[in-house]
């Protein structure tokens, strides 16, 4: 019998034993956290617009210096091809999933601030001071994808899949994921899943429908990655509206395959823009053998307040008062990091 999951009744506030990392000395300001944590505060600026940025910044450039860093990523998208090669893909919906292998250069540490994307001021970009694309190759066969996995796998065969949020161009998603991968110091093979967003604050409803449009494609990507012998561990990192797409894809996989692949071990949801009632149902339908979920939430997230208003006043998972739901979240094996207070609540994985 399925266990009832209730987010509607707040639980008692946590005792001191529940609080693992606490208050005033928030560790997120330290250099170590800046370079190691995957999502906070690296994702905080994702929702912002891109006014004033040059277009067509993805045209590959040549570099003559060796002091830059490189991130080699596989990019899967349901976007429509753009007419300009410097844009690659637009915000409109494509008819099939497309794969590209991109190499992004990141300026030397002395020329940038950790946690930020140094956007090109003009085209072509200056790799010494700005993010730039060094290589763009179309991946048109399964063998090419397998070759990429083998080239980029680490000793533990770890993969990280990033699903961006609302209001992102293709370039936004590519540069931001490159920044997260580099600044987190991870050597997991990076895969970006980017869905059709019109990159407009007025495009919320179009973007939401685009996540539904892209659900099956993300399911297929996760399943194919899990089936690869070159992959041993998958972490999924999603932000904002991308968390809805991620949760729906995992739910769909569980229903199609009867269970979520065991290789999908960690799912990180940053500022999840998901109706709390819907999230409850998604968790139930994922089944008992779910991955370990970590949620970054804040009652001060203004973007989620707007989403809550648009969605009929129903709380978003990323905007709930986590201290009021400690017991129920722990019972579900969910770890919560409250970014408004820097409190961390840990729970064992449902698979433990």
Region spans (language model):
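Bacterial N-terminal signal peptides that target proteins for export
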Residues: 10, 23-38
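Bacterial N-terminal signal peptides
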Residues: 39-46
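Serine-dependent carboxylesterase/thioesterase catalytic core
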Residues: 51-63, 78-79, 83-99, 103-105, ...
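Aromatic- and Gly/Pro-rich amphipathic surface segment
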Residues: 95-150
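Proline/glycine-enriched tight loop/beta-turn segments at coil->beta junctions
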Residues: 153-157
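Short beta-strand element of the alpha/beta-hydrolase
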Residues: 158-163
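Conserved small/polar residues in nucleotide/adenosyl-binding loops
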Residues: 345-352
């Amino acid at each position: 019998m399925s266990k009832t999951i209730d987010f509607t009744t707040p639980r008692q506030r946590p005792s001191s034993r529940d609080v693992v990392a606490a208050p005033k000395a928030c560790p997120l300001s330290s250099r170590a956290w800046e370079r190691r944590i995957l999502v906070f505060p690296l994702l905080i600026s994702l929702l912002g617009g891109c006014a004033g940025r040059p277009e067509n910044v993805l045209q590959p450039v040549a570099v003559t210096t060796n002091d830059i860093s490189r991130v080699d990523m596989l990019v899967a998208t349901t976007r429509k091809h753009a007419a300009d090669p410097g844009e690659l893909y637009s915000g409109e919906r494509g008819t099939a999933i497309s794969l590209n292998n991109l190499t992004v250069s990141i300026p030397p540490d002395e020329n940038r601030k950790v946690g930020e994307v140094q956007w090109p001021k003009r085209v072509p970009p200056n790799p010494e001071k700005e993010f730039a694309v060094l290589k763009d190759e179309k991946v048109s066969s399964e063998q090419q994808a397998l070759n990429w996995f083998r080239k980029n796998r680490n000793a533990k065969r770890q993969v990280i899949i990033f699903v961006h949020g609302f209001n992102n161009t293709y370039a936004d998603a590519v540069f931001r994921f490159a920044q997260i991968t580099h600044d987190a110091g991870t050597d997991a093979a990076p895969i970006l899943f980017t869905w059709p967003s019109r990159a407009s604050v007025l495009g919320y409803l179009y973007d939401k429908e685009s996540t539904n449009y892209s659900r099956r494609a993300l399911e297929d990507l996760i399943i194919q990655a899990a089936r690869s012998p070159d992959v041993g561990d998958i972490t999924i990192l999603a932000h904002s509206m991308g968390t809805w797409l991620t949760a729906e894809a995992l739910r769909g996989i569980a229903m199609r395959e009867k269970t979520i692949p065991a290789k999908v071990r960690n799912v990180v949801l940053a500022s999840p823009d998901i109706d709390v009632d819907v999230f409850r149902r998604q968790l139930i339908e994922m089944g008992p053998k779910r991955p370990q979920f970590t949620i970054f939430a804040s009652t001060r997230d203004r973007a989620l307040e707007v989403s809550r208003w648009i969605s009929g006043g129903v709380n978003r998972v990323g905007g709930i008062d986590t201290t009021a739901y400690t017991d129920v979240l722990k019972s579900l094996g969910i770890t919560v990091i409250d970014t408004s207070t820097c409190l961390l609540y840990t729970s064992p994985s449902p698979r433990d």
